Amino acid sequence: QLLLEGRDVIGPYPGGRFRDVDVAYEQTAAGSKVLATHLGGFIPEVDRFDASFFGISPREAAFIDPQQRLLLEVGWNALEDAGQVREDYDRSRTGVFTGLWTTDYENHILGQPKDPEFYLLTGCGRSTACGRLSFTFGFEGPSVSVDTACSSSMVAIHLACHSLRRDECGMALASGA
């Protein structure tokens, strides 16, 4: 949609977005600190997530990385846009290939004063993101998380195409966050 509208969504850091802004600074050769970047792509209201729609308790949802929340929402939208209904894909050989890289939310949770809960493992683990999609949508094909830094989404798409060509799955959902 952004490409179609020609919109630029890169902007300055929103107030209160970083608990410790020092992580955004780098040391110069002279020993002074400079902000590595003044801009970023930030999703407004990233904490707004209809957990109950996906059968997730509010307690568990608090520990789910926004990347996983968005993958669920966008995955659902992609299936709807493709005209797929639950009966068509539930228990199907659908593969999920997800490109993920950062652990910012996990670092944020671990920096909180109270002890994290068990849900941190499933909510912030990059390896569990594709499994969450497969489980939620009832897919029974390959479920692969990909971490190749900046190329993760592209590699996820490549692996999805490869899996389709090899008949390892009948349909594939490729995503990246």
Can you name each region flagged by the protein language model?
Residues 1-177:
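Cys-dependent condensing catalytic cores that perform Claisen condensation/acyl-transfer
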